[in-house]
Amino acid sequence: MNTLPIDLYKVIEYGLGGDTWQEFIDRYKEKYDLLQIDGFEFEATKLDYTFSQLITSLGVKTLPAYVDPESPGYEAALGELEGRTGNIPTQKKFYRLNRVTVRQQLQLLQRVGMSALTEEMQNLFLGLLDESADGLIGSYYNALTHQRMRIVSTGKFTIDTDNNPRGLKGITIDFNIPENHYQVLAGTSRWWTKDEHIPANQGSASDPIMDVKNRVKEIRRKYHYLGKIRMELAQDLWDDLMTHTTVLKRIGHSLYPTVTDDSTVIANAQNEDEDRLKAIFKKLVKVDEIVPRDSYAFVDKPGKDADGQPDLITEQVENFKATNIAFIPVGQIGTIQGVEPLTLGYEANKVASYDGGRLKLTQRANPETHSIYIESEAAQMCVPRMPQYMFISTVTV
């Protein structure tokens, strides 16, 4: 009877079903053909961990941790790392396959040999690999989406407790958007003065349509941007905006010019199709596009389980800043810059490249814990190249 010894690398081999690790990873290219990084295009990878911002003119599944390039995933923050330096931070994450996870299957293979490798068992091993690879690739793309949304909606990228609870903290990368491009509404001019966006909490002097219209006029006349303008905001803020009574009144009077009673036109506007409301709003404020962003990320952070025991918990974090509106050029506004991570010390068949080498996925054995680690590493950064044509308004609380 064949009783060849079985180790955890056999899990990888059985799960691959005859493919190499690289061939297995290549399968995900078709799945992840959609990515929310519009306005940013990939550059060729660099040799060092720095980004360059060439400013041009116009006639703009859980997140991995950002860590020092030489540190393992989820490394503690390094105090000497400074933000605003043009450095591209490294992200790492891993899944662990251990003998507890597949103990029964491995014991059966150990006793009986390859004849025990059923299709069901192979699918189980494949599922473990798929969960790991799919999770790491998805995290890589989610991280780029998170970067893009935060940079567009805040003008900066901050690595801190909310989006990187187990890694570096207190790092802000500034992309040189001029300070006078930031607008903050105050007092009763804020669209809502409390975080519950209901009519009772509307700022008494708030007029969202006039605010946006004046902002666009300022961008055109003061800052001399003559191209097409896209207005971006969080989906929740857009939904709330379409309930603001001042907005409904203005849109209602535009749709029903013969009706003079405010309460009637507000009621009529509330019953209108959302696409029609958006079209009227866009026409009134004179922007070319309005893009609500229904986008969130998730992070793993130390916490407690349902029994109060220490555990990792998953927490949702916003991608697009919910209190802000961004005004940016339509089209490309930046590039994604980064390096191809080094994989020195790994056997060639334990390394796979994804997205042109921007993401590396490796297999590493740890005999002490009887585990195989499926690890990812990437160092990419969305870099705006038109900061002089990016504008951000904070309109509410």
Model-based region annotation:
Residues 1-52, 383-397:
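N-terminal alpha-helical "arm" segments
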Residues 14, 18, 27-31, 115, ...:
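Surface-exposed polar/charged interaction patches
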Residues 25, 211-216, 350-351, 382:
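Short, Φ-rich (hydrophobic/aromatic) sequence segments
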Residues 37-112, 166-174:
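Assembly/oligomerization interface modules of large self-assembling protein complexes
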Residues 38-59, 135-138, 142-172, 177, ...:
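Contiguous N-terminal and early-domain "leader" segments and peripheral loops that mark the onset or edge
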Residues 89-181, 207-239, 370-378:
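Long, contiguous amphipathic alpha-helices that act as assembly "spine/axial" helices in icosahedral shell
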Residues 166-281:
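Extended, solvent-exposed, turn-rich assembly/linker loops in the middle of proteins
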Residues 203, 247-397:
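Sequence/fold signature of self-assembling virion shell proteins
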